[in-house]
Amino acid sequence: MYGDISAKAAHMLSLPKVSDFFTRLIQRVSPKSYQQAYGEVYVTQKFLENFCGDQVRFLARSFAVPGNHLGQQSHGFRWPYGPVAIITPFNFPLEIPVLQLMGALYMGNKPVLKVDSKVSIVMEQMLRLLHNCGLPVEDVDFINSDGKTMNKLLQEANPRMTLFTGSSRVAEKLAGDLKGKIKLEDAGFDWKILGPDVQQEDYIAWVCDQDAYACSGQKCSAQSLLFIHENWSQTSLISKLKDLAERRKLEDLTVGPVLTFTTDSMLEHVNKLLEIPGSKLLFGGQPLKDHSIPSIYGAIKPTAVYVPLEEIVKGKNYELVTKEIFGPFQIVTDYKSSQLPIVLDALERMHAHLTAAVVSNDPLFLQARFYVTNQVIGNTVNGTTYAGLRARTTGAPQNHWFGPAGDPRGAGIGTPEAIKLVWSCHREIIYDVGPVPNNWEIPPST
């Protein structure tokens, strides 16, 4: 059934009239450019295409192992949890809830879905589309509420598993409240390393700009910390980053309102960073002008602050530098080849290991064979790590895993592996039908 529903829904989202409707609806509630909002619709449509026909059935493929006597065999099954809950954030009003909701349904669960109330109209409309495509209305419960009400519902209803996508603070509270019966895709302070091989300067500058400032930096995968190898110091990379950032404007929402930080709080953070010895403002650091954005939201120009590497790793500075600002903001630093162990130490100390990028086509750098301790990929744990000249931190499509690593509570999204990990558990059933040997007798007690 769900293969058929997916096929019909994928077809609907492929229609220009429907995709434009959802793109515009996303823009109404989430400050994104048209192209960024359309990206959500596109990924969602492709995800649904991936699970048409028998692909849903294949998700639940089991296996059998012969036993140790005639008539015995064990069967391993992917088993649904049953009653589950899904809580999703404001920054991807369509993509995250649809991919997680459908994953839960594909594996046979009964979900209650809560989307951030600021943007929940998008998913309300999508549910109506799914109902029109054959989704039984009783298969999904959809709730609009504040966080406190949802927390009470979770504690009283006691779902067997809850998927939470959102802030680390709320994630840790829920993990305690729900006694660990939770999967998390929470905050990411995501880093990018530019390796020693300098090439394709314009392309790499553009990707850095997209990673840091698309959707006004309000992605859990947004580039938060950029490490630039000293070989790039002779290039115009920083000036190109500045030029790209300055062409973003409120009129087309290539920069826009920040929904979880005020302008004052973001600028206060910038000023604190500028008190660190050797730090400097590379660009931005000013409020947007000529707008009517309410003061409860943030509105600043795309901003980058340089902080020396040796200052970043100092205990008194590290927590400040690695504070996630969910807005158009990033830290930039540089490093020498001999300082790579310091860079790796800084990465290891981070608590959120979501996305990362190692921008280099130098295989010795990617695997870091300088010394055992100098490993880049081998000494990091980010669940979605891009490596190579075109490496990025954002823009994950539907065709590869997206999620953190290094935490047993970590959730993935989009792929068969992610769906099976998050929305099912392993159950083993051992069939032992005999026959009992003809000469069997009751043995001595043991």
Where do the protein language model's features map onto the residues?
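Hydrophobic alpha-helical scaffolding
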Residues: 34, 74, 116, 143, ...
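ALDH superfamily catalytic-core signature
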Residues: 132-134, 157, 169-316, 338-341, ...
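Rossmann-like NAD(P) dinucleotide-binding subdomain of oxidoreductase/dehydrogenase enzymes
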Residues: 27, 58-204
